[in-house]
């Protein structure tokens, strides 16, 4: 009706004419969990932030687990932990197989590492992060058979030349060519472990530079995929759970990771073979996380190449997070300001701040 109460106007009639109807979207946008999920890693980082440099890995990790477990049950999803703190008998919370979320929303695989780099956190060193990944139910690789895998990761521009079965020297040269760099311009990120002595020797023989990290190869893999990070390639053996979480991030960024399972001993090798795993198979990014709707969130605990750590001010703190979604390709960097006195009024998590001080607005 028009404002005067008479019949339909010409414009109103036209709006109902099928020839004037806008083409509908192919599908309604599904619920974007990213902003809900980042609250979980923020909570983990803020809880662990109180333990930085105190020499207690278990204390810091436990605080992060408690905080994340409390927050994750407010997230609109029906999640199952596929990568968590271990088996139920050894992990009271966030154990493998635990159901998480508020019971509404999509069915999801949930992978979490409350602190990637517990040693880094306990010593106050750089690059400790709180991290999680979510994907469609049944799309994450089962990491239970073999604890370690050999990995190589690179960003989108060189994803098509990666070959974990080739010598590292060939991979370095191939990536350098695609990126229009000299081999001597390349930087390879490697975990500083005795098992990597030959790998380090081979990389040095090419003339490429090396960045050795003591822990935290999830952050290292992400750095290899981000432009202007100073890292061009990640290589070496690290944890299988961390490899799957890194693959979720890499799916969102369009990079590539390849991996092969690396049993520690004959017993683990037999376990993997009996479970039907092919130890010679090259696992691609899509093999590790096959879903089309993947979310990844990380919040810095200590300062690092990727994220700033938790910073405390009178009455509050700041957190720095990265949030990614594969379906949209969106990568968000979020700097959040938290007034701890306000949080403690309603939160079951004790973030313990000076409630009498002035809140630091941005």
Swiss-Prot record:
N-acetylthreonine modified-residue sites: 2
Q: Which cofactor does it need?
A: Mn(2+); Mg(2+)
Q: Quote the record's cofactor note.
A: Has an absolute requirement of bivalent metal ions Mg(2+) or Mn(2+).
Entry note: thermal dependence: Retains its full activity until 30 degrees Celsius. A significant loss in the activity (65% loss) is noted at 40 degrees Celsius. Complete inactivation of the enzyme occurs at temperatures greater than 50 degrees Celsius.
Q: Name one GO molecular function term.
A: fructose 1,6-bisphosphate 1-phosphatase activity
Residues annotated as binding Mn(2+) 2 are 113, 116, 242
Record-listed E.C. numbers: 3.1.3.11
Activity regulation note: Is inhibited by Li(+) and by inorganic phosphate.
Q: Which residues bind substrate per the record?
A: 116-118, 148, 193-195, 215-217, 239
**Biological pathway:** Carbohydrate biosynthesis; gluconeogenesis
Per UniProt, the keywords (alphabetical) are:
Acetylation, Carbohydrate metabolism, Cytoplasm, Gluconeogenesis, Hydrolase, Manganese, Metal-binding
Comp. bias regions, Basic and acidic residues: 17-30
The induction field says: Is expressed during exponential growth, with mRNA levels approximately half of the level of sigA.
Which residues bind Mn(2+) 1 per the record?
61, 85
Record-linked NCBIfam families: glpX (TIGR00330)
Q: How does it assemble?
A: Homooligomer. Probably a dimer.
As a miscellaneous remark, the entry gives: Gluconeogenesis is critical to M.tuberculosis ability to establish infection and is necessary for its survival in the host.
- This one is known as Fructose-1,6-bisphosphatase class 2
Organism, as annotated: Mycobacterium tuberculosis (strain ATCC 25618 / H37Rv)
């Amino acid at each position: 009706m028009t404002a005067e109460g008479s019949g339909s106007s010409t414009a109103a009639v036209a709006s109902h004419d099928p020839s004037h109807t806008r083409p509908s979207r192919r599908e309604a946008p599904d619920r974007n969990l990213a902003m809900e999920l980042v609250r979980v890693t923020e909570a983990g980082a803020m809880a662990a932030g109180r333990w930085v440099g105190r020499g207690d890995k278990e204390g810091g990790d436990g605080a992060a687990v408690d905080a994340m477990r409390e927050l994750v049950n407010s997230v609109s999803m029906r999640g199952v932990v596929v990568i968590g703190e271990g088996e139920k008998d050894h992990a009271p919370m966030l154990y493998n197989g635990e159901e998480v979320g508020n019971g509404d929303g999509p069915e999801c695989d949930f992978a979490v590492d409350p602190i990637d780099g517990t040693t880094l956190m306990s010593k106050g060193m750089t690059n400790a992060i709180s991290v999680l990944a979510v994907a469609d139910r049944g799309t994450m690789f089962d990491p239970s058979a073999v604890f370690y895998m050999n990995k190589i990761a690179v960003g989108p521009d060189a994803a098509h030349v990666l070959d974990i079965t080739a010598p590292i020297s060939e991979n370095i040269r191939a990536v350098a060519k695609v990126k229009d760099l000299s081999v001597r311009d390349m930087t390879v990120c490697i975990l500083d472990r005795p098992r990597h002595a030959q790998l380090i020797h081979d990389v040095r023989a090419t003339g490429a530079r090396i960045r050795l990290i003591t822990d935290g190869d999830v952050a290292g893999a992400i750095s290899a995929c981000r432009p202007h990070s100073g890292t061009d390639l990640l290589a070496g053996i690290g944890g299988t759970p961390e490899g799957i979480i890194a693959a979720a991030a890499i799916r969102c960024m369009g990079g590539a990771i390849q991996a092969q399972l690396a049993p520690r001993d004959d017993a683990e090798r037999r376990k993997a073979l009996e479970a039907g795993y092919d130890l010679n198979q090259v696992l691609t990014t899509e093999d590790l996380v096959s879903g089309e709707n993947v979310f990844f969130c990380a919040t810095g605990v200590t300062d690092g190449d990727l994220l700033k750590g938790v910073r405390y001010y009178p009455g509050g703190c700041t957190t720095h997070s990265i949030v990614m979604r594969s379906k949209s390709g969106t990568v968000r960097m979020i700097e959040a300001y938290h007034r701890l006195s306000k949080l403690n009024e309603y939160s079951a998590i004790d973030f313990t701040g000076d409630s009498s001080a002035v809140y630091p607005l941005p």
